[in-house]
Amino acid sequence: MTQSQRKILVTSALPYANGPIHLGHMLEYIQTDIWSRFQKMRGHECHYICADDAHGTPIMLKAQQLGIAPEAMIAQVQIEHEQDFADFNVAFDNFHSTHSEENRELASDIYIKLRDAGHIKTKTISQLYDPEKSMFLPDRFVKGTCPKCKSDDQYGDNCDSCGATYSTTDLINPRSAVSGATPVMKDTEHFFFDLPAFEGMLKEWIHSGSLQSEMANKLNEWFEQGLQQWDISRDAPYFGFEIPDAPGKYFYVWLDAPIGYMGSFKNFCAKRGDINFDDFWAKDSTAEVYHFIGKDIVYFHSLFWPAMLEGAGLRKPTSVYAHGYVTVNGAKMSKSKGTFIKARTYLDHLDPEYLRYYYAAKLSSRIDDLDLNLEDFAQRVNSDLVGKLVNLASRTAGFISKRFDGKLANVTDNSLAESFIAKQEVIAEFYEAREYGKAMREIMAMADIANGFVAEQAPWQLVKDDDKQAQAHEVCSIALNLFRILTTYLKPVLPRLSQDVEAFMQLELTWDNLAKDMTAHEIAPFKAMMQRVDLDKVAAMVDASKDNLQPTEAPKADKKADKKVEKKATTGDPLTDDPISDEISFEDFAKLDLRIALIAKAEHVADADKLLKLQLDLGGVTKQVFAGIKSAYAPEDLEGKLTVMVANLAPRKMRFGMSEGMVLAAGPGGDELWILEPHQGAKPGMRVK
């Protein structure tokens, strides 16, 4: 190899430690793993690092629901995550947790450097306070008697019994749900990172080639609106790291999450003993650092993270690579349809190599969504991997073993193999640029040529003629050498198959030995390497992924149950199920002020089954909206998206807080809801006409 060795650190976004991995997550880990494996095949020093993102309110609340400590929950989730990744052949060099001493030390050190440099500001906000427990109380921790219907044990701003909303001060006999004490209002100080101070650096960095062009252009909107200071603190109770010199204040999860890359790498360095942490993270580092992420967390990694690193005197990433979402059969993953498929459910039914190849065949360097069409999935895997690749060996290997003592021939014409080897730099460039789909097409085009050669030469006919034994030997030897070259190119994508091929060919598949002379090379007897995708197993996987909507036994009579409204049966025709409403005047329509809004923040709402709390940025004006879309979206899938909102809807007080508008969504409900997303070019604050 003529190229010089590179020092590379590559990461995938940290999976959140409150639930299982699903096939949407797996896109990123497969994409990154392929890139990491390719770099190692090329002889570079490449370390693939990841960790569980193990802090935040959702984890704290879920642990409380389970009746266990958050530490116990995240430890169990980490075991499950690591097993799923291992079974998908995702080869991390280190997988750690953000809830680690390495991460605590690094987060504190970075914060102190930012603070001492004047990049941390403080602001005062007011919250409910428990004087006995000395803790600030979210609404869910204040209870009392409803001032309307006099029902006991109601939350501070909403009554579950009568549906009334009211001010916390109107609650009769208010008490802390933690201690029973009467709460008071008290000011609390929050800490903010001074992001605007880094505007010049960020503008230069995002247009330096470190980001995909569409990502860089999208981030321009943040500068047009004006960068805002970023709240990096949360009050107890909170599961995370306490802020230095600020008792009761905790780092917001998104501060220590990206530092988790560094924490895991520091843990890895300690395990290895021969890798210097500072060689990769110091300001003057010449190593390369790459983050693979989903498009929903671009602004955290491309604004906050590089600014934090700059302010702390550390190096910034070489590049941040974003990918799109996964849809299944052309639609958002759905539990009711069985297309919200967990990694473990997939592994219980199908070979992980299938999905690795299918994702690779559809991945590019762009931020496009990827559709896992299950019918196309089966057809493509069966055609490409079984029909073209493995079939090349299965049709020819038997003749070598049975008739020619398991040894390849001295080939007189190597032109076909030489033409395949000549493609190595083209394929390498595609892998390097994350254009995996182009690489797969190039490889399969060669597989077509190889199979065409075998079909034309028909060794099964040649072996019948005693005078053509040498020709049959040579044809089969050429075919197996082509099979070896093709599998070498596919090794980053298909590691398990590559191991089987290495055992069969009795040599290691490396980039350096692509041109190896295979004369008289001995092979092992051929064994079946890959089965066709069984559509019955695909159907069983989908069925196993469906929510069981039917109760296992008849429910007992319940007054509350009598009040529940059953979901209406639908025909599947939107206009039949939901006819067009009566006409309104243009004047009535003109009263609506529809605006483009950026979802700056999305959060779960404690004790709310359907609601997400959204902070919507209208280009200088921020509105808080409670949206009934929890069944269809996770908060992390929404942040950074543009949507459309009704901006002039009268504020409505809810038990969880004030809702100042409404986001627009389509669909019958449940997990079949889709928020409206404007095309690129639309900007927060623009009126929808």
UniProtKB/Swiss-Prot annotation:
Motif 'HIGH' region, residue range(s) on this chain: 15-25
Annotated segments matching region Disordered: 546-577
Quaternary structure, per UniProt, is: Homodimer.
For this UniProt entry, what is the primary localization, expressed as one broad class?
A: cytoplasm
Which InterPro entries would you find in this protein's record?
A: aa-tRNA-synth_I_CS, Anticodon_Met, Met-tRNA-synth_bsu_C, Met-tRNA_ligase_1, Met-tRNA_synth, Methionyl/Leucyl_tRNA_Synth, MetRS_core, MetRS_Zn
Q: Indicate the enzyme's highest-level EC class.
A: ligase
Any Pfam family from its record, for instance, is tRNA-synt_1g
Q: Where is the signal peptide?
A: none
Q: Where is the tRNA-binding domain?
A: 588-689
Name the PANTHER family for this protein: METHIONINE--TRNA LIGASE, METHIONINE--TRNA LIGASE, CYTOPLASMIC
Reactions performed catalytically: tRNA(Met) + L-methionine + ATP = L-methionyl-tRNA(Met) + AMP + diphosphate
List residues binding ATP.
335
The EC designation for this entry is 6.1.1.10
Q: Where in the cell is it found?
A: Cytoplasm
Q: Which family does it belong to?
A: Belongs to the class-I aminoacyl-tRNA synthetase family. MetG type 1 subfamily.
Which protein, by its recorded name, is this?
Methionine--tRNA ligase
Any one annotated GO CC term: cytosol
Q: Where is the composition biased (Basic and acidic residues)?
A: 555-570
State the source organism's domain of life: Bacteria
> For the motif 'KMSKS' region, what are the positions?
332-336
What does the record give as the function of this protein? Is required not only for elongation of protein synthesis but also for the initiation of all mRNA translation through initiator tRNA(fMet) aminoacylation.
User: Sorted alphabetically, which keywords does the UniProt record give?
Assistant: Aminoacyl-tRNA synthetase, ATP-binding, Cytoplasm, Ligase, Metal-binding, Nucleotide-binding, Protein biosynthesis, RNA-binding, tRNA-binding, Zinc
> The organism's lineage?
Bacteria, Pseudomonadati, Pseudomonadota, Gammaproteobacteria, Alteromonadales
Q: Which GO terms describe its molecular function?
A: ATP binding; metal ion binding; methionine-tRNA ligase activity; tRNA binding
